C-alpha cells in the first residue's frame, strides 16, 4: 500500500517487488480532505500527484489497484480502503512504508490486516538516531543537531571543519529589499495542469465545493520529473540571491527567491540527498555564495529532519499543547483574507490563492498575529495544515505549535518569537499605505501587532520572566507606565472582542492594480502601491520595541 505522501518508487515498499505476483494499492478517501478542511490547492496537489504516480507504475507493467474519490464503491477512510482491498485481493502479505503521521500509524498498526510497516528511508535521520541525539539532553536545540548531521553526512565540510570556517551564516542572511524592492525576480518554474490535474480540479469543485482557497492558477509539480526541473531552476536562478533575501517580503511578490520545493519533498517526489547535493555542488562550482547555500541546506538537512524528530518524540500529546493557555478563537479572516491589516491581507491572500507563503510570512505575519492575539493553538494548527500545499503533520505541527505559537513551552524554540509591527515594516513594504502605524500601540491608527505585542508581554510577564532570553523585552515593558498599559490592554481587549480586528476598521477584500495576475485574487496586491494610495503619516514613536528577530528559525518552505 502506498499513501499520498509516499510517492517514491525507490522506497522500501518496492524492495523485491515482483510484477508477476505483487500489486500496488492506493486510495483517495474523503476523510483525508475532511479531518481538517483541506484547501483546494492542497487537495489538488495530493490527488493529482497520486494519480500521476499510479499511472507511472502502471506504465512499467505493474498491477495498480487505485480507489478514486468518485468511485461508486469508494470507502470513506484509508483503513476501510485497505480492508476492502484485502478482502478483494486476498494477498499473502500487506506491506507499506510507515506512515509519516501519528494518526495513520496508529490506525494501521491496529488494523486487522496487520500490514507490515517498513522504515522510511527518505529521511536522513532515523528515529533511532534522533533518540540517540536526544538522550541525556535537558533541552534540544536544532543548531547542535544540525552540526551533527553535517558531520555525519559530510555536507559542507572541509575535512573535519565546516566549509568557510563556521557552521552558520544566518547573520549574513537578514537583508531587506530596501525602498527599490526586489528588482527582477526570476520566474517560478510552474507547470501547466495536464488532463489528469484538470480532472482532479473539476472533481474537487463538484465533490468538495466548500473547500477553502483556490486552484484556478494551480501549477505545482505533480511528477518526479517536474519536481526535478523545479529544483534545477531554483539552483540555477534563485539560490544565489536566496541567502540575502530569504527573510524579506514584498507586496505582490509571493515567490521571490525561494525554492518552492517543500511540497515535492514532502510527497517524496524529491529526495533530500539530491536536494542537498545540488545546492552544495552549486557552491563548489562557484555558482552560488556559501551563506546562501548553507542557509538553504540548513532548512533541509537541519530543520526538516529536526522537526520530524521532535514530532515523533512528542506525540501523541503534542497536538494538545497550550503552554500559554491561549483561548481566543482563530479569526474568520484567516479563511477569507478579508482583513484591514495590509500584511495579513497579503500573506493570507496569497496563501489561499496558491497554498504557499514563505517561512517569514508564516512565522512573523500569520503566526505572529495568532501568537499575540492568543489564538487557540489547535485551531491555528488546523489552519496551517489545511491551507499550505506542503503541509503534512509531522513538519507542520512543530513549526506551528512550537515555533510560531510557543504552545509547547519551549520544546522547539528557546523563546516566543514576539515582535511589534516594526519588524514587518523593516522586512517588507507592507506598511506603506496601510492605515495602521507600527510605531503606535494605542489610538485608532495604532498597529494591532504593536498593541498586541505589549499586551502579550504584560499578560504573560510572570511566565516569560523565567526565560532569560526575554529579559530585554520585559525590561522595555517595565518602562511603560500604568496609564499606557491600561490603554494598551483596553485596545487589545477591543481587538479580541471584534474577531481580531480593531473596532471600526472594517475589512478590505482585495487590493487592485495593473497586474492582472494579482488583482483578481483576494488579498494579493500588485507589486506597486495601489493607485491613489498616499503614504501613511508616521506618528510619534511610542512603545516601539520591535522585539527580537528570530534566529536559527525556519518554517520550512
Segments the model singles out, each with a brief description of its role:
Residues 1-69:
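N-terminal beta-strand-loop-alpha-helix module at the start
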Residues 2-5, 27-28, 67-69, 96-99, ...:
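Short His-Asn-centered micro-motif
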Residues 3, 229, 248, 252-557:
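C-terminal catalytic domain of photolyase/cryptochrome flavoproteins
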Residues 45-65, 95-96, 354-378:
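Hydrophobic/aromatic-rich, well-ordered segments within soluble, folded domains that form packed cores
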Residues 62, 69-71, 84-88, 92-94, ...:
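A structural signal for the main folded, soluble domain(s) of proteins
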Residues 62-77, 336:
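Glycine-rich phosphate-binding "P-loop"
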Residues 77-220:
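Beta-rich, aromatic/charged-enriched effector core domains that present basic-aromatic interfaces
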Residues 163-291:
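A charged, amphipathic alpha-helical module
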